[in-house]
Amino acid sequence: MTASERNIQHAIVARLRWHGWMVRELSQPRAVSGELVGVPDVIAFKFGHTLLVEVKRPGGEVRASQRQFALEIEPHGAPTLAHWITSDVDDFARALNYLELMSDIVTVREQE
């Protein structure tokens, strides 16, 4: 993961946590062991909803294993599952706001 991908990922994770999501970062050298190849960098949960986020630097390319993972989970998706590939924090924030609005997910901070 490049420095710019790390910066983007940190900003996305911070945004998710601010919105009350329980977040786990999965990005690590997984290909070495052959396990979890293609699995996104970030997984987040909130009120039964699951988000999978693959972080790319601007202009970064999606690997074949990441495309394959997206194809494999697609038939198992539900309205509560989103799998995003992003390199833009602002676009991600807008998509997250839209998802929460459309899914009636209330941000914890808005309840306080």
List PLM regions with ranges.
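Catalytic phosphate/metal-binding cores of nucleic-acid and nucleotide-processing enzymes, i.e., regions
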Residues: M1-E112
